[in-house]
Amino acid sequence: MPRSLKKGPFIDLHLLKKVEAAVEKNDKKPIKTWSRRSMIIPDMIGLTIAVHNGRQHVPVFVSDEMVGHKLGEFAPTRTYRGHVADKKAKR
């Protein structure tokens, strides 16, 4: 279920402070975060945010189509290697 409109979007305060500082300085360095649950807000457009996927930080360049989505949606946590093919089916 989506979040109630009266509550507004959720964003961790430590991430919000880093975003505001980067916008103020016009800094293009990636912002490293573990907060996959934070929502992308319009202030983040044009920034690169390194989102942790459990193993490493995946760089995510934020565009205007991403506003309203969560950061974790753009850093996959699982690697799919495909199903093992049956040897009899190959013949």
UniProtKB/Swiss-Prot annotation:
Gene3D superfamilies cross-referenced by the UniProt entry: 30s Ribosomal Protein S19, Chain A (3.30.860.10)
Annotated keywords: Ribonucleoprotein, Ribosomal protein, RNA-binding, rRNA-binding
Any GO BP annotation: translation
UniProt GO MF annotations: rRNA binding; structural constituent of ribosome
Gene Ontology terms: cellular component: cytoplasm; small ribosomal subunit
Disulfide cross-links: none
Role noted for this protein: Protein S19 forms a complex with S13 that binds strongly to the 16S ribosomal RNA.
UniProt record similarity statement: Belongs to the universal ribosomal protein uS19 family.
NCBIfam families from the UniProt entry: rpsS_bact
Name of the featured protein: Small ribosomal subunit protein uS19
Organism from which the protein derives: Pseudoalteromonas atlantica (strain T6c / ATCC BAA-1087)
